[in-house]
């Protein structure tokens, strides 16, 4: 009986301690405890590393961009040339667009549409954040001319329509900054060249038709819309505004038909309790948000 009992004890499996592996071989223990790794495993790891290195060394093929229209800079399948004027608009005003570098490659930018509607010698785009007489003598000369205006809202800005009525020299050039509001502010205040032209702003009640991009307030306009309104005032021709807005309307309509959503202004979202992002902790930014909620001009 005792011998049978001993046999049963020997046949019963020994309970493994928690966390122990099924294999208690020395190699397994060493792997578990961070000890020496078997040669075969080490060779396999080195082979994997070599394969990964070879993959990194392979030449990277550049992403293929869709063919673009040479006139409107839109992909050929969604070309907006049918909505552009057959010939560039005849204007006497020179337009300078100061474009922030971040805007240059944005898909839904409006400056190429604006430039496609105007003569090349009347519309010039300068890309950058800092400008000086040494870097851009042409722009420096333009800024110092008495007939040059810069369109940027502010307490010191004159209303454009009122200014041209009283100005002894009729404006021949207008400068517009292209970028987000924070980018435009940075360009305007950190370039002393832009202190020379007369600062003007638009006094208009129209709402932006650029509904596929969020604006800070209901009164903010895109660069193309600002140029359309300003040129129609300076040229005393409302047809200019209608013509320049046509490709913008087509762009927004096409995007909305293909899944884009109407982007309401931040002011509208705040006033109607629809703003879902957390309020900023920075006091200066928080103050701006409060001004937007109270429809105070900032």
Swiss-Prot record:
Residues 1-52 are annotated as: Disordered. Its EC number is 2.5.1.25. The lineage of its organism: Eukaryota, Metazoa, Chordata, Craniata, Vertebrata. Coiled coil: none annotated. InterPro entries: DTW (IPR005636), DTWD2/TAPT (IPR039262). It holds the Pfam family DTW. GO terms for cellular component: cytoplasm; nucleus. PANTHER family: TRNA-URIDINE AMINOCARBOXYPROPYLTRANSFERASE 2 (PTHR21392:SF0). A motif (DXTW) lies at residues 178-181. One of its GO terms (molecular function) is tRNA-uridine aminocarboxypropyltransferase activity. It comes from Macaca fascicularis (Crab-eating macaque). This is tRNA-uridine aminocarboxypropyltransferase 2. Catalyzes the formation of 3-(3-amino-3-carboxypropyl)uridine (acp3U) at position 20a in the D-loop of several cytoplasmic tRNAs (acp3U(20a)). Also has a weak activity to form acp3U at position 20 in the D-loop of tRNAs (acp3U(20)). Involved in glycoRNA biosynthesis by mediating formation of acp3U, which acts as an attachment site for N-glycans on tRNAs. GlycoRNAs consist of RNAs modified with secretory N-glycans that are presented on the cell surface. The modification N-acetylmethionine is found at residue 1. Belongs to the TDD superfamily. DTWD2 family. It catalyses: a uridine in tRNA + S-adenosyl-L-methionine = a 3-[(3S)-3-amino-3-carboxypropyl]uridine in tRNA + S-methyl-5'-thioadenosine + H(+).
